[in-house]
């Protein structure tokens, strides 16, 4: 065998092998590589998108949290105002009630004073009538009259 002929035969076999590979194997291999590259690119894009979505979600959560805190603060402030208003209303109502009770007590005291005065007037008039009866029954002299008035004054 001749080396040249062997080299030419091997070169032809290699060329056929290369043509066969380029015709049948290379497109499948390039398709797999291209598909893998696309999957990797899609994965990287998805990771970037997920990272952006995460940042957006974190910002949204922070905004929601700030909004919730503001609402909670507003509710607390409103509850405090309502409680203070109820306290003020209760104080005002207690003052009105206290004033009403004082007024009733004054009226009751005034009524009792008037009743006592009326009772005293009645008693004084009865004593005056009794004194006048005694004076008229007795003889009217200065000494007897003074004694009766002293007795009447002692009874008063």
Curated annotation (Swiss-Prot):
It is a single-pass membrane protein. The chain crosses the membrane at residues 12-32. It is found in: Cell inner membrane. GO terms for molecular function: proton-transporting ATP synthase activity, rotational mechanism; proton-transporting ATPase activity, rotational mechanism. GO terms for cellular component: plasma membrane; proton-transporting ATP synthase complex. Keywords: ATP synthesis, Cell inner membrane, Cell membrane, CF(0), Hydrogen ion transport, Ion transport, Membrane, Transmembrane, Transmembrane helix, Transport. It comes from the Bacteria. Pfam families: ATP-synt_B (PF00430). CDD domains: ATP-synt_Fo_b. F-type ATPases have 2 components, F(1) - the catalytic core - and F(0) - the membrane proton channel. F(1) has five subunits: alpha(3), beta(3), gamma(1), delta(1), epsilon(1). F(0) has three main subunits: a(1), b(2) and c(10-14). The alpha and beta chains form an alternating ring which encloses part of the gamma chain. F(1) is attached to F(0) by a central stalk formed by the gamma and epsilon chains, while a peripheral stalk is formed by the delta and b chains. F(1)F(0) ATP synthase produces ATP from ADP in the presence of a proton or sodium gradient. F-type ATPases consist of two structural domains, F(1) containing the extramembraneous catalytic core and F(0) containing the membrane proton channel, linked together by a central stalk and a peripheral stalk. During catalysis, ATP synthesis in the catalytic domain of F(1) is coupled via a rotary mechanism of the central stalk subunits to proton translocation. Belongs to the ATPase B chain family. This is ATP synthase subunit b. The gene is atpF.
């Amino acid at each position: 065998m001749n080396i040249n002929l062997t080299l030419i035969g091997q070169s032809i076999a290699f060329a056929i092998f290369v043509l066969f590979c380029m015709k049948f194997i290379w497109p499948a291999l390039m398709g797999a590589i291209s598909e893998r590259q696309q999957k990797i690119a899609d994965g990287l894009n998805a990771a970037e998108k997920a990272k952006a979505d995460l940042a957006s979600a974190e910002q949204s959560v922070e905004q929601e949290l700030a909004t919730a805190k503001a609402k909670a603060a507003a509710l607390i402030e409103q509850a405090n105002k309502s409680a203070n208003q109820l306290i003020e209303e209760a104080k005002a109502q207690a003052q009105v009630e206290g004033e009403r009770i004082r007024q009733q007590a004054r009226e009751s005291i005034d009524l009792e004073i008037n009743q006592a005065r009326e009772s005293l007037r009645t008693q004084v008039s009865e004593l005056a009538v009794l004194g006048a009866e005694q004076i008229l029954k007795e003889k009217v002299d200065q000494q007897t009259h003074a004694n009766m008035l002293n007795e009447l004054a002692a009874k008063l």
